[in-house]
């Protein structure tokens, strides 16, 4: 069995939703708007800030259990979806209620550069083939809420976007 640790919009991914998921904690990293989507949630002209994992702290997300017969297909799909030269595909240990598991995680090298007002404006302006920046944050906020997880950054930004 393979595991995938989801911490951003991947938590709302329809393909992964077919597999059992459990809350999981990744120590040593936290969520930040550390990347840009220029295709899925944004465009080259109006890139959408998206979440990445940056060193320090901890991050709660979901660990999806992928059966062996689906591992190669899921890995290819995720590599295509998550591919960006800033990201490194690595295996990390994540803690779940049933113990530690080794999971695929995409980790960033650096954090956000925008203040809250600039980040909000960029999210409102972004539109891509999957959706817009506001929908991106909604997807993450709802997935966190659905699983009883909390992230102050995501929740504060979502509140700003819907007000």
Regions found by a protein language model. Give the residues of each.
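A glycine-rich, hydrophobic/aromatic-adjacent loop/helix-cap motif
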Residues: 1-163
């Amino acid at each position: 069995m393979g595991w995938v640790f989801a911490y951003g919009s991947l938590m709302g991914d329809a393909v992964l939703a077919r597999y059992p998921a459990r809350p999981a904690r990744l120590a040593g990293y936290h969520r930040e708007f550390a990347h840009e989507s220029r295709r899925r949630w944004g465009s080259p002209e109006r890139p959408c800030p998206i979440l990445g994992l940056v060193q320090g702290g901890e991050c709660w997300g979901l660990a999806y259990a992928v059966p062996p017969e689906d591992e190669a297909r899921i890995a290819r799909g995720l590599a295509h979806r998550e591919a960006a030269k800033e990201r490194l595909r690595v295996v990390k240990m994540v803690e779940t209620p049933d113990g530690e598991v080794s999971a695929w995680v995409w980790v960033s090298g650096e954090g956000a550069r925008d203040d809250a007002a600039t980040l909000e404006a960029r999210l409102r302006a972004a539109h891509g083939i999957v959706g817009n920046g506001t929908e991106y944050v909604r997807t993450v906020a709802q997935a966190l809420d659905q699983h009883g997880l909390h992230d102050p950054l995501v929740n504060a930004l979502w509140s700003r976007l819907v007000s």
